[in-house]
Regions:
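Claisen-condensing/thiolase-fold acyl-transfer catalytic domains that form or cleave C-C bonds
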Residues: 1-16, 116, 120, 138-216
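Alpha-helical metal-binding/catalytic segments enriched in His/Glu/Asp
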Residues: 4-8, 29, 69
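An acidic, phosphate/nucleotide-engaging active-site surface
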Residues: 14, 21, 37
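Short coil/turn connectors at secondary-structure junctions
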Residues: 17-23, 55-56, 64-65, 76-78, ...
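Short beta-strand segments
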Residues: 23-29, 70, 200-204
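Active-site-adjacent elements of ketosynthase-type condensing enzymes
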Residues: 28-50, 84-102, 145-155, 176-181
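Condensing-enzyme catalytic core mediating Claisen C-C bond formation in acyl metabolism
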Residues: 44-117, 121, 203, 215-216
Length: 216
């Protein structure tokens, strides 16, 4: 869920140390096999109600791909700038969502509850590390699992819903690709202006939470 943000962070550190001049970050997500295998299991007459519920989240997954080029600031001085970010973990909850190529088993209720607790800790760290104040951030690009999860984050942090572009209704949960795809769509719509501060937010299985900033 956070692989693209993690990739940006690793690349950013390498660029700052002068180890590389450019970095290409690429993510591709496909859910076709998961759909087929999940539906086959859900048709089994021996499936219990609990097993059925645990399989449901797999059907919210979507397909998508994105790529981003990062460079040292002196090579592209007028480009948007990645300011870095913070990450926090709560690995005691590592069993809430487990998956592989053909199956994902999820406790959606506990994932939401514990994920939001971790997000609150991460947001507090972002305030200290990057001087975040909700009203001073122009857009919030959120890794989107569902309307319930997105609305919970908006409510918890007091975010203006108009600053959160949602794509899950059309694309589903496209995992790590959701953050760069939302960012790209905002650019296409002309919503990103030079100097604007854009927050990138994501909660992933593990549990892990990352928050970062781009200055356009």
């Amino acid at each position: 869920c956070l692989a693209f943000l993690n990739g940006m962070d690793v690349a950013g550190r390498m660029l700052e140390r002068g180890e590389i001049d450019y970095a290409l970050i690429v993510d591709g997500e496909t859910a076709n096999m998961v759909y087929q295998k999940t539906l086959a299991r859900m048709k089994s007459p021996d499936l219990t109600e609990e097993q059925f519920r645990n399989e449901l989240a797999s059907l919210t997954l979507g397909c998508g791909a994105a790529a981003m080029v990062l460079s040292r600031v002196e090579l592209c001085p007028d480009a948007p700038r990645y300011r870095g970010g913070v990450t926090r973990s709560a690995t005691e909850w590592n069993t809430l969502c487990r998956g592989n190529l053909d199956r994902m088993v999820t406790d959606t209720r506990m994932l939401l509850i514990e994920g939001m607790k971790l997000a609150a800790k991460t947001f507090a760290a972002a305030r200290l590390a990057m001087g975040w104040a909700v009203e001073e951030l122009d857009e919030f690009v959120v890794h989107q699992v569902s309307r319930v999860h997105t609305d919970a984050m908006i409510k918890a942090f007091g975010i203006d819903p108009k600053k959160v572009m949602t794509i899950f209704a059309e694309h589903g949960n496209i995992g790590p690709a959701s953050v760069p795809i939302v960012l790209s769509k905002l650019k296409e719509m002309g919503r990103l202006k030079k100097g604007q501060r854009i927050a990138l937010l994501g909660i992933g299985s593990g549990l892990n939470c990352s928050m970062a900033e781009v200055v356009w």
